[in-house]
Amino acid sequence: MVNQLEMLYEGKAKKIYATDKEDMVIVHYKDDATAFNGEKKAQIESKGVLNNEITSLIFEMLNKEGIKTHFVEKLNDRDQLCKKVEIVPLEVIVRNVAAGSMAKRLGLEEGYELKTTVFELSYKDDSLGDPLINDYHAVGIGATTFEELNKIYEITAKVNEILKEAFKKQNINLIDFKLEFGRYNGEILLADEISPDTCRFWDATTGEKMDKDRFRRDMGNVINGYREVLNRLRN
């Protein structure tokens, strides 16, 4: 049993709290929804509850598959106990199908099947709009090392294969998603969350979107999409 102490950090969708165990934190999932680097904001009732449950199920699955993550256990509807990591200030964006900003940037039709999975790297800085960078930028600015980045890409590739297969069984296409990583006792761990906030999930039969694009694009029924992802994961 751990006890929650002071808040260490508040992000767009989560709060991080210290605990009486120095190497553990409590991650609290909020109902806040944001898009376009915080320009669009709303409260969506139960979003935090659903994202906590979805992320917990996915991290439990990844842990069983040998992927080392920061996740320890789900504590309640909104809270997880996680290892306290030093976040690598990078996001790895994994694209299996062209959609969103990549489709727009490269003039591709949304839904275009990429010839190979594409990894993109962005520098985590809201004031700069999380700009896309390459490996040399990442190492050059001191965000990581080539050795660490190779490890991150190795984990990313494994996670992509595991998740694609898992969601395929639930008739969901994993279009793209973003991952974050942290350092813990000299190791690289998968961190943050994996949820409809951070992934594009399309129904494999109808193409219906079941993710944050429903909020970004004012499609309505945002929470129904999240709930559908959770219901299928539970099967």
UniProtKB/Swiss-Prot annotation:
* Entry keyword annotation includes Nucleotide-binding: yes
Organism, by scientific name, is Clostridium perfringens (strain ATCC 13124 / DSM 756 / JCM 1290 / NCIMB 6125 / NCTC 8237 / Type A)
Q: In which pathway does it act?
A: Purine metabolism; IMP biosynthesis via de novo pathway; 5-amino-1-(5-phospho-D-ribosyl)imidazole-4-carboxamide from 5-amino-1-(5-phospho-D-ribosyl)imidazole-4-carboxylate: step 1/2
Write the Enzyme Commission number(s) for this entry.
6.3.2.6
Specify whether Ligase is a keyword of the entry: yes
InterPro entries found in the cross-reference section: SAICAR_synt/ADE2_N, SAICAR_synt_PurC, SAICAR_synth, SAICAR_synthetase, SAICAR_synthetase_CS
Q: Which NCBIfam families match?
A: purC
What is the enzyme's main class?
Answer: ligase
Q: Which family does it belong to?
A: Belongs to the SAICAR synthetase family.
Q: What are the entry keywords?
A: ATP-binding, Ligase, Nucleotide-binding, Purine biosynthesis
GO:BP terms for this protein? Answer: 'de novo' IMP biosynthetic process; cobalamin biosynthetic process
Q: Can you name this protein?
A: Phosphoribosylaminoimidazole-succinocarboxamide synthase
- Known catalysed reaction(s)? 5-amino-1-(5-phospho-D-ribosyl)imidazole-4-carboxylate + L-aspartate + ATP = (2S)-2-[5-amino-1-(5-phospho-beta-D-ribosyl)imidazole-4-carboxamido]succinate + ADP + phosphate + 2 H(+)
Output the PROSITE patterns linked to this UniProt entry: SAICAR_SYNTHETASE_1, SAICAR_SYNTHETASE_2
Instruction: Name one molecular function that GO assigns to this entry.
Output: ATP binding
